[in-house]
């Protein structure tokens, strides 16, 4: 259960009792607040972020928590199973004194703390099964957490018990049974996962918002979807409210822009401009000279490089490992075909899906990605980016991504061009479900926020 390698949602619940980050990122507004840090400042050029640690912070053994511990932790998290390349723009991490951490980046960053919700461990403890942390509890064997008598914070933890019992399970059905018999009081789960097991006892249900985006991607080298006028029309054809409510069971937020609607730079007015609107869909197709030229019921597009018109047809691929994404992709395909497209949906196993993306063997795809907390889109538009499929590398978009990192007010220009050109079509952002036995815990996301925001997962299938 290492904080950098653990992928189990429920096991990561436990980590919030054992460890603390420099900053916490709220799932309510995607803004960073200090925890182990007391403050930070950014240099005028945006390339250096200096973080000041709380002088009273210490580990559970009573030893001081230093900037060297923080530097070691951030460096150790790079390339791990859970944190991957989250800090890809960070070129240097070093302690300048006992309580001052200095980070340098290869591009200007307005708010690097959005990426610093990584648990801090003791210097030199990376290879330990359960490294020393600074949280309000410590492990006592495999099935019990006890209060950390050296906890540096003066306020009581939100979950204020002398001990927390842990239950070992192997299957989701065992999670369900233990929750229904009240052996377990809290369960964190993805209600749209194939492994989800529903509950039937009396419970309270909370949702936790995430930067996990589902979207439509395109092969812009194809003869049909190379036309950005056609691609940009598709945003108007997607009923995102229907997908979020009926396909996702309400555990999602419809999103026209590639950021959570809760993010401070999500522009609702801009989103409304490109939202579901069949009148605008028809107008955009008309402006792109897309029409049913031979009256066969399928739209046609004149391709200048060919010298003749082709049907607006193609294949959308989706990873078969998620029944929810298959269902959502099916809805998208049906909606487009009802409007004159001729799209075939093809489900592929994970390895086949990845290979098809990498080789460009698709026209469209329905993907899912865990974006970083600042919703950086660089991996889509950099030639070396891990999400750059179907010829998506674009120097103008890459420059706009860089400008958005330097000042999130620049996100407007990035998102406007993305919608106008139809590089990708955002659909929704997923939520997780937090189940608690009634009356046992109040506002559970308050104390588990720091790990509920996943790192960037650079695979389109999530």
What are these regions (language model features)?
Residues 62, 179, 316, 337-383:
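Periplasmic binding protein-like
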Residues 1-44, 75, 449:
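N-terminal lobe/hinge region of extracytoplasmic solute-binding protein
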Residues 151-197, 342-344:
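Ligand-site clamp/hinge motif
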Residues 9, 26-27, 104, 108-165, ...:
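Gly/Pro-rich hinge or "lid" segments in bacterial periplasmic/extracellular proteins
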Residues 235-270, 324-333, 357-462:
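Detector for C-terminal structural segments
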Residues 1, 48-51, 70, 101-103, ...:
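Short, well-ordered beta-strand elements
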Residues 38-81, 224-226:
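Aromatic- and charge-enriched surface segment that lines or borders ligand/interaction sites
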Residues 146, 227-333:
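Append "and occasionally in soluble cytosolic enzymes with long acidic Gly/Pro-rich linkers
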């Amino acid at each position: 259960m290492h904080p950098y390698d653990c992928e189990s949602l429920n096991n990561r619940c436990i980590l919030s009792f054992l460890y603390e980050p420099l900053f916490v990122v709220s799932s309510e507004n995607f803004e960073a607040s200090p925890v182990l840090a007391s403050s930070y400042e950014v240099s005028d050029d945006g390339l250096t972020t200096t973080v000041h640690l709380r002088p009273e912070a210490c580990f559970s053994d009573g030893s001081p928590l230093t900037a060297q511990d923080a530097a070691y932790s951030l460096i150790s998290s790079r390339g791990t199973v859970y944190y991957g390349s989250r800090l890809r723009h960070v070129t240097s991490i070093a302690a300048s004194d006992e309580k001052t951490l200095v980070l340098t980046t290869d591009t200007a960053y307005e708010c690097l703390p959005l990426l610093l919700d990584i648990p801090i461990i003791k210097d030199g403890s990376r290879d330990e099964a359960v490294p020393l942390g600074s949280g309000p509890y410590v492990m006592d064997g495999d099935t019990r957490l006890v209060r950390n008598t050296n906890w540096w914070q003066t306020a009581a933890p939100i979950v204020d018990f002398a001990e927390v019992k842990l239950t070992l399970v192997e299957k989701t059905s065992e999670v369900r049974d233990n929750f229904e018999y009240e052996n377990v009081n809290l369960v964190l789960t993805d209600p749209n996962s194939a492994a989800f097991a529903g509950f039937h006892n009396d419970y309270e249900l909370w949702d936790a918002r995430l930067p996990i985006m589902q979207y439509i991607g395109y092969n812009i080298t194809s003869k049909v979807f190379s036309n950005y006028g056609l691609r940009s029309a598709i945003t108007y054809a997607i009923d995102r409210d229907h997908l979020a409510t009926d396909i996702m069971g309400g555990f999602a937020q419809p999103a026209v822009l590639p950021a959570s609607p809760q993010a401070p730079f999500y522009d609702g007015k801009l989103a409304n401009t490109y939202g579901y609107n069949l009148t605008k869909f028809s107008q955009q197709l008309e402006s792109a000279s897309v029409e049913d030229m031979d009256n066969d019921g399928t739209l046609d597009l004149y391709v200048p490089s060919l010298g003749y018109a082709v049907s607006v047809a193609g294949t959308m691929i989706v990873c078969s490992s998620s029944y929810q994404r298959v269902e959502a992709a099916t809805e998208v395909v049906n909606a487009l075909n009802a409007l004159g497209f001729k799209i075939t949906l093809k489900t592929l196993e994970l390895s086949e899906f990845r290979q098809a993306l990498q080789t460009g063997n698709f026209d469209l795809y329905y993907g899912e990605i865990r974006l970083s907390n600042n919703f950086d889109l660089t991996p889509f538009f950099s030639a070396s980016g891990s999400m750059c499929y179907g010829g998506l590398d674009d120097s103008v978009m890459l420059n706009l991504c860089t400008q958005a990192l330097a000042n999130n007010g620049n996100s407007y220009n990035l998102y406007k061009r993305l919608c106008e050109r139809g590089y990708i079509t955002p659909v929704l952002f997923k939520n997780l479900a937090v189940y608690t036995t009634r009356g046992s815990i109040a506002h559970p996301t308050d104390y588990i926020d720091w790990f509920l925001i996943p790192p960037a997962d650079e695979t389109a299938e999530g």
